[in-house]
Regions:
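Intrinsic-disorder/low-complexity loop/linker signature
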Residues: 22, 53, 128, 185, ...
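Extracellular calcium-associated, cysteine-rich motifs in secreted modular proteins
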Residues: 178-241
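Outer-membrane beta-barrel channel domains
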Residues: 2-11, 17, 23-156, 161-166, ...
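A short, hydrophobic secondary-structure junction motif
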Residues: 74-76, 121, 175-176, 193, ...
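Outer-membrane beta-barrel pore domains
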Residues: 14-20, 63, 179, 183, ...
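Solenoidal tandem-repeat scaffolds enriched in leucines and small polar residues
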Residues: 139-179, 193, 202, 240-269, ...
Length: 343
């Protein structure tokens, strides 16, 4: 059932608070959606106001940075998932592949607007065959990869609407989601100077960098007591100076995970008021062994599987979704591993 066509115009409103560059702002966002035939465009028109009533201008300095116009586009969409071909670019919300054993209600918007991910979700329906492709954030492709999902499905016939599907999901680099504002390859969570690409370590936390950052840092800026023991480092033996190790680096380090699932489902009841689906699903997750170049991250190979049988899914009046599953889990399989909070 393709459902009713989208309204020509809709408006969303967002009110809340958000932290940007370490400052807490009140947020007022207007999110209009414009639909013309099969094309839909969602916009993000937002202002940030600090606790003194000042509006943050960074997002609206379009004269000096025309690229900010692209940030106002929340998504561009062509068609719906029931059409012969469809695609959506930008924000991805509520994405489920198959019956959700691997990916359920996934969103690339959880850290929006401090992190703006640009996803792609596209697919086709040709007779009894359907396909779907998903990329979480094409910006991460240059950092080793992003979450990618594929689904293929086949429906036996209109008289026997038994649907068989296969899903493949991989995160080619689980580290690519780590923020690195200064792009020095050291994630902000490990970087003592996340806004300065020439600095990264400050053992005693006094704001002065440790030695060892290279010739780009003047000697006058280097901490003379880097380990904070109240003894000038020049007067100590090197073996007595305890400094942080070089932080974990994103450079040449990756960790992946891969999931594969098979499902079969049959619609027992389908009407405007109620729908009822029964299904079974087999899922596997694999986490290959990882050892980073500096041994700061080590993970042994792990894997697991899960079976959902039987599964029952129902929708009441188009507003209430119910599901019930009996699961058998083995090893390191985590149901709905790629969910709303994954990123």
């Amino acid at each position: 059932d393709p459902g009713p066509p989208p309204k020509p115009f809709a408006m969303g409103l967002g009110i809340g608070s958000v932290t940007l560059d370490g400052v807490l702002y009140n947020q007022l966002a207007l999110r209009p959606e414009i639909n013309i035939a099969k094309v839909g465009i969602g916009l993000d028109l937002v202002v940030y106001i600090d606790n003194e009533g000042n509006m943050r201008d960074d997002e609206w300095d379009i004269e000096n940075d025309p690229g900010l116009l692209l940030d106002k586009i929340l998504f561009i969409r062509y068609g719906k998932k029931t059409d012969p071909a469809w695609i959506k670019y930008g924000s991805i919300e509520g994405l489920t592949l198959g019956y959700g054993g691997l990916m359920n209600n996934y969103s690339n918007m959880m850290e929006f607007p401090s992190v703006r991910r640009v996803g792609v979700n596209t697919g086709f329906n040709i007779g009894p065959v359907g396909g779907e492709l998903f990329l979480s954030n094409i910006k991460d492709m240059s950092r080793g990869g992003t979450v990618t999902g594929l689904r293929a499905a086949y429906t036996v016939s209109d008289d026997l609407p038994l649907a068989i599907g296969v899903n493949f999901i991989t995160d080619a680099n689980m580290f690519s989601g780590l923020k690195d504002k200064d792009e020095d390859s050291y994630p902000d969570v490990f970087d003592d100077f996340p806004d300065d690409s020439t600095l990264w370590n400050d053992t005693d936390g006094d704001g002065w960098p440790d030695p060892g950052h290279g010739d780009s840092v003047l000697d006058s800026l280097v901490d003379i007591d880097a380990d904070g023991d109240n003894i000038i480092d020049a007067e100590e033996n090197i073996s007595d100076i305890n400094l942080k190790a070089t932080p974990f680096s994103l450079k040449d380090n990756t960790a992946s995970t891969t999931g594969l699932s098979f499902d079969i489902g049959y619609p027992v009841l389908q009407s405007d008021a109620i729908s009822l689906m029964i299904y079974a699903e087999y899922n596997t997750l694999k986490f290959p062994a990882v050892s980073t170049s500096d041994s700061s991250f080590i993970r042994k190979e792990r894997s697991g599987s899960g079976i959902s049988v039987p599964g029952i899914r129902s929708t009441l009046f188009g507003i209430l979704n119910l599901s019930l599953e009996y699961r058998i889990i083995n090893g390191s399989y985590v149901p709905q591993f790629f969910d709303q909070a994954y990123d």
